[in-house]
Curated annotation (Swiss-Prot):
Keyword Acetylation among UniProt keywords: no
Family listed: Belongs to the sodium:neurotransmitter symporter (SNF) (TC 2.A.22) family. SLC6A18 subfamily.
Gene: Slc6a18
UniProt subcellular location: Apical cell membrane; Cell membrane
Binding partners and assembly: Interacts with CLTRN; this interaction regulates the trafficking of SLC6A18 to the cell membrane and its activity.
Organism encoding this protein: Rattus norvegicus (Rat)
Protein name: Sodium-dependent neutral amino acid transporter B(0)AT3
Length: 615
């Protein structure tokens, strides 16, 4: 046990362990790992679908009682024990080694599909250097006499995404072929990641200044431009208008808790690895609070930026809807051109409905409400590659804004990949399973190459379906289980008193009552509640996916299909296999200890001198 005034007995264990050049590198690395694509395309969606400003109430409650306490534990144990995820948990208890292996496994799986998202971003980024943008118009059909029917039915942006980028199949069972343009982008992405992590924190520490700070510059530029566009005020009003009644819905609280959990990248092992390179007496409490608050403020900042642009898109779509209706009225009733303005349209329509309802009823008039267009938001890739991309399309200088947007997404994803790869590479070195003569550059290259080969399946025509499966099942339940085991392991196995002594030694201040209560009671209860809620949701949800099928009668809506049986088995395996490391390693350690005791007992019996007997 480390005393506040004593020497650290662990410092000499790894004197040669690399250290950050300065504190800013460490903070930016943790922020870059935590602040990822989810801050841009998931939090704004949750905020606007769950009561606007009302969603911030459960969000910040989850931040205070779940996110920050768990984050503090990870930074503290990484800094104190100076090891990666596997080494930390083996040091705390050999029976908890499975937690580290589980975190390692999830980081590996997430790295596979996360870098695939980056290849999509890279493809759009490269195509943004064209004028006009390639998704601004439909291509001509084979006869060169009209436009491709699929594009006319779905829209230019959706067609470019689903057909010209993914070339997606209409069923997950039809794997299709490798899309070579995506394959080359995958090569470029993994090469970029390798060059950035080739020397661990020595190389990522240099790159992180750009990858972590550039997104904030672009968000600020977009915010300034967005606030000057028509409809920005309506978008922000729609986003933050509170609906307090929605707080009665338990799903809102679950989504808030899970968003905090995944947004901070808890239980991946990356933060433990980053903290292990700190000076032993660094103030990790201040770091945990600072990074967590920056992460949450970034989510809010991104939401304001995104919905200022989305308000412009909705206003633009609303205006075009009115223009189409006005044109129909002018053609039907022989009004002079430009005789009906958008402001006059409601009163003119009301008059015609009262005087000539039969003629009006025959017209293909659409119902135009600004709120309906604001409702057409999306989460995940749908926001980045379809909704927001279409919004940028209507902005003056669209190519410039597209380059900035996808450049921002690429740097966001790249800095998150640094943390994922640290969660994979650092434990491998800490386990000492490799010959000491193997250079770090070689080992890092082998890991990146294995990840690249494993991720080739995502470049198939059915690859996006598989990415959705990995995104939905590979991390969610596993990380919740690992986080719960982290709290239990530190508080009840390592010992709360010993842990508090260590923190006092590192920071010079003993953890307050708030920290101890959240670690002992609140955070474990919240994690257990999230785990049960996830199990219930999985049991209630149908094992289905939405396919892009031009032959579907309701196209361009995506057709809902059930996963084949073998795919459902894959989903179950992804959900629980990494977690099986926990009982598996504990059982193996138990058997090992039992075998050792059995050997020692028999050895003692064999060496014990036999009593002399009389004649």
């Amino acid at each position: 046990m480390a005393q506040a005034s004593g020497m650290d007995p662990l410092v000499d264990i790894e004197d040669e362990r690399p250290k950050w050049d300065n504190k800013l590198q460490y903070l930016l690395s943790c922020i870059g790992f935590a602040v990822g694509l989810g801050n841009i395309w998931r939090f704004p969606y949750l905020c606007h679908t769950h009561g606007g400003g009302a969603f911030l109430i459960p969000y910040f409650i989850a931040l205070v009682f779940e996110g920050i306490p768990l984050f503090y534990i990870e930074l503290a144990i990484g800094q104190r024990l100076r090891r990666g995820s596997i080494g930390v948990w083996k040091t705390i208890s050999p029976y908890l080694g499975g937690v580290g292996l589980g975190c390692f496994s999830v980081s590996f799986l997430v790295s596979l599909y996360y870098n695939t998202i980056l290849l999509w971003v890279l493809w759009f980024f490269l195509n943004s250097f064209q004028h006009p943008l390639p998704w601004s118009t439909c291509p001509l059909d084979l006869n060169r006499t009209g436009f491709v029917q699929e594009c006319q039915s779905s829209g230019t942006v959706s067609y470019f995404w689903y057909r010209q980028t993914l070339n997606i199949t209409s069923d997950i069972s039809n794997t299709g072929t490798i899309q070579w343009k995506l394959f080359l982008c995958l090569v470029a992405c993994w090469t970029t990641v390798y060059l950035c992590v080739i020397r661990g924190i020595e190389s990522t520490g240099k790159v992180i200044y750009f990858t972590a700070l550039f997104p904030y510059l672009v968000l600020t530029i977009f915010l300034i431009r967005g606030l000057t566009l028509p409809g920005a005020t309506e978008g922000l009003t729609y986003l933050f208008t509170p609906n307090m009644k929605i707080l009665q819905n338990s799903r809102v609280w679950l989504d808030a808790a899970t968003q905090i959990f995944f947004s901070l990248s808890l239980a991946f092992g990356g933060h433990i690895a980053f903290a292990s390179y700190n000076q032993p007496r660094n103030n990790c409490e201040k770091d945990a609070v600072t990074i967590a608050l920056v992460n949450s403020m970034t989510s809010l900042y991104a939401s304001i930026t995104i919905f200022s642009i989305m308000g412009f898109k909705a206003s633009n779509d609303y205006g075009r809807c009115l223009d189409r209706n006005i044109l129909s009225l002018i053609n039907e009733f022989d009004f002079p051109e430009l005789s009906i303005s958008r402001d006059e349209y409601p009163s003119v329509l009301m008059y015609l409905n009262a005087t000539q309802p039969e003629r009006v009823a025959r017209l293909p008039l659409k119902t135009c409400h600004l709120e309906d267009f604001l409702d057409k938001s999306a989460s995940g890739p749908g926001l980045a590659f379809i909704v927001f991309t279409e919004a940028v399309l209507h902005m003056p200088g669209a190519s410039v804004w597209s380059v900035l947007f996808f450049g921002m997404l690429f740097t966001l994803g790249l800095s998150s990949m640094f943390g994922n790869m640290e969660g994979v590479i650092t434990p491998l070195f800490d386990m000492g399973i490799l010959p000491k003569g193997v250079p770090k550059e070689t080992m890092t290259g082998v890991v990146c190459f294995i990840c690249f080969l494993s991720a080739i399946c995502f470049t198939l025509q059915s690859g996006s379906y598989w990415l959705e499966i990995f995104d939905s099942f590979a991390a969610s339940l596993n990380l919740i289980i690992f986080a719960f085991m982290e709290v239990v392991g530190v508080i009840h196995v390592y010992g709360i008193k010993r842990f508090c002594d260590d923190i006092e030694w590192m920071t010079g201040r003993r953890p307050s009552l708030y920290w101890q209560v959240t670690w002992r009671v609140v955070s474990p209860m919240l994690l257990f509640g999230i785990f049960l809620s996830y199990i219930v949701l999985l049991a209630q949800s149908s094992p289905s996916y939405k396919a892009w099928n031009p032959q579907y009668e309701h196209f361009p809506s995506r057709e809902e299909k059930l996963y084949p049986g073998w795919v459902q088995v894959t989903c179950v395996l992804l959900s629980f296999l990494p977690s099986l490391w926990v009982p598996g390693i504990a059982l193996a350690q138990l058997l090992f200890q039992y075998r050792q005791r059995w050997k020692n007992t028999h050895l003692e019996s064999a060496l014990k001198p036999q009593e002399s007997r009389g004649c």
